[in-house]
């Protein structure tokens, strides 16, 4: 089902706070940089995004782009209170251990690199880690550290990325009260992967957890043979939009908040210009059906094999 028509430009977390489409600052921005360099290209891109109307910036410890976000926050004319900043604790991956000695250290490092007194949303980047990778922290203990940071005012909201239902249930159990349940689960979502793990979107939406989508444009950017090509072309022509705008609008109408990025000003503008048209229920269902028949997963292949 789609959400109601005339979608607002912002969603709300279950605590009532407004959150809008995110400008991502993922690792592609630092591939040509050494770890201590600051990418002026990324700083300029964030400043451009803010100028065009983005009010949500998504970064992460693992991206190594918090310094760039901090520099942009320092230079922009947009008041800090009008910008939603999301970042993430990296608990380690494969042979790579967590960058910080603890989740609390990760939060303090984020505040310092971002140059802010608080972060609007702090996520655990992945639930797939061992205590050896995290210097001794289980998922529940990492969550307890986020709870304490929220109590201390260092973070306003807390959540997770790439969580399946069993992970979320662990976080519920580790929370002192529903006030400290995760408010966001950021997952890979696009027509070819409508549930990163079994029934995750419905579960989140039934429990007041906002689903954010990374890689919402995967059918255009990552898939070699796009089974949606004809459908997207037809809908783009019908609504006088780009195929990317059709996909982002589809994501919104599924009740999911996209995280997107581009180095091109025209595409950044397009990503914000999604609210003057609406796909019909039949069109959304057509995209759903074709997507389900052509599954594609870009990330976490092994981790979700049994989830």
From Swiss-Prot:
The keyword Heme does not apply. It comes from the Eukaryota. Optimum temperature is 40 degrees Celsius. InterPro entries: AKR, AKR3C2/3, Aldo/ket_reductase_CS, NADP_OxRdtase_dom, NADP_OxRdtase_dom_sf. Gene3D superfamilies: NADP-dependent oxidoreductase domain (3.20.20.100). The record marks 88 as: Lowers pKa of active site Tyr. It catalyses: (R)-pantolactone + NADP(+) = 2-dehydropantolactone + NADPH + H(+); isatin + NADPH + H(+) = 3-hydroxyindolin-2-one + NADP(+). Its EC number is 1.1.1.-, 1.1.1.358. Changing residue 58 to A: Decreased catalytic activity to 4.8% of wild-type. Keywords: NADP, Oxidoreductase. Signal peptide: none annotated. Optimum pH is 7. One of its GO terms (molecular function) is oxidoreductase activity, acting on NAD(P)H as acceptor. Belongs to the aldo/keto reductase family. Monomer. NADPH-dependent conjugated polyketone reductase with broad substrate specificity and strict stereospecificity. Reduces ketopantoyl lactone (2-dehydropantolactone), isatin and camphorquinone. Does not act on menadione, p-nitrobenzaldehyde and pyridine-3-aldehyde. This is NADPH-dependent conjugated polyketone reductase C2. It comes from Candida parapsilosis.
